[in-house]
Design a protein with these regions (language model features):
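Glycine-rich oxoanion-binding loops at beta->alpha junctions
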Residues: 36-94, 134-148
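Short glycine/serine/threonine-rich phosphate/pyrophosphate-binding segments
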Residues: 1-10, 34-35, 79-80, 93-107, ...
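Accessory alpha-helical/coil subdomains and C-terminal extensions
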Residues: 85, 96-98, 104-108, 115-116, ...
Length: 187
């Protein structure tokens, strides 16, 4: 799947290039974890068995880019908190996976002097500079498999089913899911 496969690939690459002495710190729930200092020391065995597992072993959260410079209800300046925790953890680099907002925040942190490697991850496949994002094709594959199964049930029972999939306004994912199995039957 998308996130776990990418996390595993990053970890395996680090271990292969730098040896098992490399320290990998997983940040729980993405930027929220970096803001509030919620982390987990990772070991090589943490990355075994996750290649085909959906979701993410580290969790995720929504931290809207437009609110990154807004002090929250606990008087926390999110950008300053992330910079402080980055330094406190002694990170050499922050690897982030995500869509447009994640990429904007990664660039903001880079502008603040942090070393950031940003990887494109969104089922919408709408990020500038890349043809395919992590997660797009796996999401399409899963949705089209479900559509195939439901189609056979609808046909055998003489019924019509409406299938809704998650996507952003550009809807590349929706179009791809609907087009592949039955190009004349998608709206």
């Amino acid at each position: 799947q998308g996130l776990n496969a990418t996390i595993r690939a990053v970890a395996k690459t680090l271990y292969n290039q730098l040896g098992n002495d490399v320290e990998i710190i997983g940040i729980i729930d993405g930027y929220r974890g970096l803001i509030y200092g919620e982390t987990r020391k990772m070991k090589p065995e943490n990355f075994s068995g996750i290649l085909t597992m959906g979701g993410t072993i580290l969790g995720t959260s929504r931290q809207p880019f437009k609110l990154m410079r807004v002090v929250d209800e606990n008087s926390v300046d999110k950008v300053e908190a992330m910079k402080k925790n980055y330094k406190k953890l002694g990170l050499d680099c922050l690897v982030v996976l995500g869509g447009n907002g994640t990429q904007k925040t990664a660039n903001l942190l880079r502008e603040e002097g942090l070393n950031v490697v940003s990887l494109p991850k969104t089922i919408d496949n709408d990020l500038w500079g890349t043809d395919k994002t992590f997660g797009f094709q796996s999401a399409v594959d899963i949705a089209t498999n479900v559509i195939d199964c439901i189609h056979s049930t609808a046909t055998s029972h003489g019924r019509v089913f409406i299938i809704e999939v998650m996507a952003h306004t550009l809807c590349r994912y929706c179009r791809r899911c609907g087009y592949y199995p039955y190009p004349r039957n998608s709206v």
